[in-house]
Structures are given as C-alpha cells and as structure tokens.
From Swiss-Prot:
InterPro entries: Ribosomal_uL14, Ribosomal_uL14_CS, Ribosomal_uL14_sf
BP terms from Gene Ontology: translation
SUPFAM superfamilies: Ribosomal protein L14
Protein name: Large ribosomal subunit protein uL14x/uL14z/uL14y
Source organism of this protein record: Arabidopsis thaliana (Mouse-ear cress)
PROSITE patterns tied to this protein: RIBOSOMAL_L14 (PS00049)
Family label: Belongs to the universal ribosomal protein uL14 family.
Length: 140
C-alpha cells in the first residue's frame, strides 16, 4: 500500500476510490466564509501522462474559493477533503459514501482556518488530521 503525501500528519492511508478530480467544485464545510472550493491540484500525487490527479477523503488539495468572502477569493489555499459522494470500500467490507462533496480550508500544517465544521466527516480524514477531528461534530 502506498502512502499519499500529507503535510504534517502521521499514520497510514489505505487505498480509496478517488472521487474528486482536478477541476471539481466541492462545498466548503467550515465557517471561514467560503461557500465553494475549486480543486486545482492534489498534494502528493505523482501521476501518469494524461491522467487527471484525483482526491479522496483525507487528501490535502490546493483549491481556490469560487463563492464566498472577497478576502478569500482569488487566492490558492490548501484544503482537506472531508466528504465525497463516490462510494469507497472500507477494510471491514462496508461501502461508504456521503450525500455531498465537501472540504475544509487549512494551513499547510493541517490546522483549520475556521473553528467549526458543518455536517459529518469521514473516519479516514479524522484519523489523519487530528485538528479537523476535534472540530467535527460527527465522525462517520
């Protein structure tokens, strides 16, 4: 199992279905004032010719804010994906998915810019990012 790059975290990440390619728009699940995040790259992806880099729950991406506060727009910000609609299989055999795609804005170390998260987050994300897990109200 290859680990995929994450800044400032420890722990193993198992293979998951990659549900969010570059150019996907996801909801912003924190209280920073951003509404939508547009994925422009995925951290730690080596890639192959003509293949779009894709992200899944727990991955750090570089994103821009498409809707939200003017001071957040037109900047490249790191974000962590906390929910995805594409089903993935967990080690216990359960197929898991959420009803929307969502991410939270973080700093390069993985500390949240906001102070609260709306909605549940995936267990895979909570295991890798303890600062995000502490702000979540539900971990599924």
């Amino acid at each position: 199992m290859s680990k995929r790059g994450r800044g400032g975290t420890s722990g193993n990440k198992f293979r998951m279905s990659l549900g969010l390619p570059v150019a996907a728009t996801v909801n912003c699940a924190d209280n920073t004032g951003a509404k939508n995040l547009y994925i422009i790259s995925v951290k730690g992806i080596k890639g192959r010719l003509n293949r779009l880099p894709s992200a899944c729950v727990g991955d750090m991406v570089m994103a821009t804010v498409k809707k939200g506060k003017p001071d957040l727009r037109k900047k490249v910000l790191p974000a962590v994906i906390v929910r995805q609609r594409k089903p993935w299989r967990r080690k216990d055999g359960v197929f898991m998915y959420f009803e929307d795609n969502a991410g939270v804005i973080v700093n390069p170390k993985g500390e949240m810019k906001g102070s609260a998260i709306t909605g549940p987050i995936g267990k895979e994300c909570a295991d890798l990012w303890p600062r995000i897990a502490s702000a979540a109200n539900a971990i599924v």
